[in-house]
Structures are given as structure tokens and as C-alpha cells.
Amino acid sequence: MSATQAAPARDRLRIAIQKSGRLAEPARNLLSACGLSWRESRDKLFCYGESLPVDLLLVRDDDIPGLIADGVCDLGIVGRNELDEQAAARRQIGLPDAYQALRGLGFGQCRLMLAVPEEWQWQGPAQLAGARIATSYPAILKQWLAEQGVDAQVVELSGSVEIAPRLGTADLICDLVSSGATLRANQLTPVHNLLDSEAVLAGAVRVPDDARASLRAMLLRRLDGVVQRQDRKLLMFRASEDRVDALAQLLADAEPLVRLPADGGALRLQTMCPGPLSWQRMEELERAGAQGLMVLSVERSLA
């Protein structure tokens, strides 16, 4: 099926996720938080949606963009690094865009970086002219080198990229970095960031016009309700009318205060705060006139 063809009509949405790997468990947990549940096949490669007509296909992460492009799956949870690599490879051979990142999901963060041997003194991209760069992301690297106007040799490897300089097969590397421990163990220093990556929800450029369209819209709304509320807290308290402005100033990073029906002489107020609320901040609010402070975790919401 070409990238411009519409996928065959189906009444069930199909999502591809990693069968195993660092994104597999967080992806399933996220979809479960959206109210999805499944019955697994015996080979554990297909999960039939029970709560909603939304099925899971469990595959290798590098298969996910292609499954979306071919219309086999409607959505996929994959690292932005893999999605961008395959998109860049398609563009470099003249194929149109077939998928796009719809939402960042807030987990699986890493960076695609150039890393050089510790004895190098990094002076900038021009230093790479004629150099051999080992990578598992040749399309992204070639695109970046072209943007910099640098002619370098890209050495494509499928794994163990970090040992290439020690083996003499490359002068430096372009690889994913999380903690940097692997680079340090191989006497490499990260010097330039090509891409900030995280898990994303990817979907076809062309939205289906059958029953899947409403399922897709509903799932996106639920995902927003889960992802956007992660690490946010609902703060509830009472205060007198003359303390509201001062308290609002102390909560400038939060959503506007919402007034609830009055409880006796005090107002009941609530707001959504980003990140954790420390004891020090709660005590500061108390000194400013807040009473009965209560902090609640928010599991999900609908805007």
C-alpha cells in the first residue's frame, strides 16, 4: 500500500507498541490509564481490546513507523529518534511523509549526540570534515551534516556503536545518550546534541474516515487527560476574601483559583499546581492566610 492510499475500512483501532524494551511497560501502563484493557493472544503478539474496540500489536520498535505507513496500524508508541530516523530516510529517497508525532508522552527521554574521544578538543561541526562517524541513525546524521555543510563519512552500525573508535572503524560516534555512563566507560565525551527524544504517539498523516476516526479522537482526548496531569496536584484550601489576592500571587505558576460555594465565613478555593508541593510552600501559604490545606494527586481529567 502506498503512503497516499487510504487504509482499508475497519471498525477497530489498532495501536502498535514495543513487545519488549524500555518503552514497552510504560506504554501499556499509559494506555491502561486511558481505560483500555485487552485479552492477549497465545503468542502474546496481539491483544484484543475488551473495554473498547482498540487492539494492540506488540512488535519491534523499528517496525512501528512502517506499520503506520502501510496502514496496518493506525497509531503507535515509539521513540521520536526512531520515528525521525525513518522519516528522514523516506525523504532522502523521495517518499512523502506518511506518519507524524501526535503527542509527546513524557517518558523514555534520551538525546542523540555526537561523542568524541576524550583526547579530542571539540571546536565545532567544521572539525568533522573527512571524519568517520559511526551511528545507528544514518539518515538523521546525514541530514544534520548536510545542514552544516560538512562532508563526513557515515559508518552505519546496528549496535555497539560506542566501541567503534576503540576498534579503529570510526573517529567518533553519533548515538543515543541517557545517563552518559556508557560513553564514560568507553572514554568518549558528548559534544553536540542532534535530537531530544522521548516516547511519542505517532499516527498516519491521513486520518481514517470510518469508525476509527471517533475512536482516535476519543483516545487522544483521554491521553491528554492523563499525560497533561502527570505530576500535577490539586490544591484545596479555605481563606477569607481579603487574603485571596496575596494567595494568588504565591500561586502564580498554578492555574487560576477556582471559588467554590462558601463554607461559613471563609471561601473555599482550589487550583491545579505543577509538580510537587513542598512542606515549605504549604507553610508559606498557611502564613499568608490559607486554612485546611489539602493536596491531592490527579490521575486523569477531561478538559
UniProtKB/Swiss-Prot annotation:
Pathway: Amino-acid biosynthesis; L-histidine biosynthesis; L-histidine from 5-phospho-alpha-D-ribose 1-diphosphate: step 1/9. It holds the Pfam family HisG_C. GO terms for molecular function: ATP binding; ATP phosphoribosyltransferase activity; magnesium ion binding. It catalyses: 1-(5-phospho-beta-D-ribosyl)-ATP + diphosphate = 5-phospho-alpha-D-ribose 1-diphosphate + ATP. One of its GO terms (cellular component) is cytoplasm. Gene3D superfamilies: 3.30.70.120, Periplasmic binding protein-like II. One of its GO terms (biological process) is L-histidine biosynthetic process. The keyword Membrane does not apply. Its cofactor is Mg(2+). PROSITE patterns: ATP_P_PHORIBOSYLTR. Its EC number is 2.4.2.17. Feedback inhibited by histidine. Catalyzes the condensation of ATP and 5-phosphoribose 1-diphosphate to form N'-(5'-phosphoribosyl)-ATP (PR-ATP). Has a crucial role in the pathway because the rate of histidine biosynthesis seems to be controlled primarily by regulation of HisG enzymatic activity. This is ATP phosphoribosyltransferase. It comes from Stenotrophomonas maltophilia (strain K279a).
